[in-house]
Amino acid sequence: MTRGEKVCAFIKAYCKIPAGAHVGQPIKLMKFQKQFILDVYDNPHGTSRAYLSVARKNGKSALIAAVVLAHLVGPEAKQNSQIISGARSRDQASLVFKLAEKMIRLSPELSKIVRIVPSQKMLIGLICNVEYKAISAESGTAHGLSPSLAILDEIGQVRGPHDAFIEAIETAQSVKVQAAAKIKKPLN
């Protein structure tokens, strides 16, 4: 199996639909979601940056939450690594965290190997001691990080050519030698 196929298999086996009419059922990746994962993880030249831009209500945030879980306790988990998702506002930053938290609570297997720290918007993968945290530009916590995976949400809200928050995250991640992916979700 390729890296991308392993991520897809992990999502299929362990991630449940976190909300809506089909809550609790296994996630079935849509064709574009599966292709996005395969393109990111199976690129023979490596992927340092990936953009996912689709219309609202097409499962972007749920897909990103599932990818976070694949890096937290799945096939992409790396010992003592750090994952972050960030957005301009606290509310938007917490969206991926909330979806991942729901997926964990819906999965007996994931519930046993992930510690949820709601007050800090943090998840800890107990197998490899991987830490995920949702951060916002409002909190000013982007400096001093060294993530192996950084997810930036709604970058379409950035006005002008420079954004200190995004730059801090991109700079922190660029020091990683083998960063898996930087996934950005433009505003739609």
Task: Report residues per predicted region.
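Phosphate/NTP-binding elements of NTP-utilizing enzymes
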Residues: M1-N188
